[in-house]
């Protein structure tokens, strides 16, 4: 669905299909990706704490209400009824179950995350969330369950994998070059072949 806001007559409807920030981050192989809601202090504190412990960069999407331009934009996730009906809490190692009476669940079928009624499946088919999967495809599929805060929406940590950071890789590359060719000297570099005089 295209998104719109009643805040301005000029910008009633967005022409372009907005991209999904979570999907972009996961598609770019981000090693830590999470989503929270500004009004949920406990969830936000948990997500920020996990991000601070993560080695490397962390991407966090926070649904933040703006009472000027888009007030009540996240009511489907923050209202008393919406919180129970639509929030899909992702907790590492736990089955993904939600709904007012835990009547809904998430399954992974053919690599795609789907929302199903628990009455229609066996509990063994319910997806058990794993933030440490090296392959981001499941996390990516979870990010596609919603596009904006409308209807059932996953929140929490989607992906949290350990790997060498960019900084560590660059330092390692420099150290390897030093071992192979020595420390190198700037004067030697300046006077090396391939230089010329400008008259």
For each feature predicted by the language model, list its residue ranges:
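Single conserved hydrophobic/aromatic residue that forms the stacking wall/gate
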Residues: 1-7, 11
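Conserved thiamine diphosphate
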Residues: 9-50
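Structural motif
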Residues: 23, 31-34, 57-59, 153-157
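Structural signal for hydrophobic packing residues in well-ordered secondary-structure cores
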Residues: 26-29, 48, 52-55, 146, ...
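ATP/pyrophosphate-binding catalytic subdomain of soluble kinases
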Residues: 34-89
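Flexible, low-complexity linker and terminal segments
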Residues: 68-199
